Amino acid sequence: MRTAISKNENIKGAMQAKSNAAHGLRDLFENGLKDIYWSEKVLTKTLPNMVKNASTPELVNSLKSQLNESKEHVSRLEKIFQENGMKPTAKKCDAMEGILKEADGLIKETDLGAVRDAGIIAAEQKVKHYEIATYGTLHAFAKTLGENKAANLLAMTLDEKKKTDATLTGIAMSTINNQAHKADAITNIKA
């Protein structure tokens, strides 16, 4: 019984790989690093807009903290690239670009206040969940490849992303979601 398909075998319905396709776990690891590196660098440019558009001090402080963390995460990724003899290179992440485009649209489509804050939290949690998935995968790849320094740095970042996600949930559930819900009631009274 065959369990693997050689790369030269034709499979009905299978996509033809690009010439620079990943051929092994190390290639996937390196591509993933480039992808999340792009994402973190873009976040350092987009988080200030979220800070500017948030109104709740607790959310503003959380977003500022996330900005500082993203800068630290960029540095960690650069260390991982260097440890692996690679030049730090960003590869556009279509998924993160889409999430951030959605976040920008959400900000433009909401009034400043609790409703916008709830939207910013929702958007930022989508970012965090993508990052958690990516860093978790990269951590597993690094461990499998025996890249222990990289695995440790990725685990640190993964833990921070999970804590940030929990913080955002706490902010949303403690006040912002209820305040945004009250805005619904006021809108319904006016209608």
List each language-model region with its residue ranges.
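Amphipathic alpha-helical hairpins
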Residues: R2-A191
